[in-house]
Amino acid sequence: MTLTARKSVLIVDDSAFIRHALCELFRQEADFEVCGEAENGKEGIDKAQALRPDLIVLDLSMPVMNGFDAARVLKRLMPAVPLILYSAFGEKLAEYQARLIGISEIVSKSEHPSALIHKARGLLYSAAA
């Protein structure tokens, strides 16, 4: 499968190590470009409004504003932009809450990184259809 245009991704995570790893993961893929990074939910919202990404990858547990609160605001401001919650938490309650908010996919940090790319592509293809 190939996409006709590169899709922009915003990475939001308070861990500089995770942000860097995710940026490198997406940059290795020919059909993605990382348009920006943010270290908390509030900064993520600001950058999303300025950069208008095709996809946003959010951590759950962050200072200033967590991933759930940021997702609520982002879904109001940019309802068509898919959100992926990339989190260490795997609880059913967190998954249920994420679905209620409108988070499109949940990927555990314990999963192989290819799962994140696979789900990102799936969301962007379904959004384009």
Describe each model-derived feature in a short phrase:
Residues 40-43, 66-69:
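Acidic catalytic/metal-coordinating carboxylates
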Residues 5-18, 22-26:
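Conserved acidic segment of CheY-like receiver
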Residues 62:
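Receiver (REC) domain active-site loop signature in two-component systems and cognate sites
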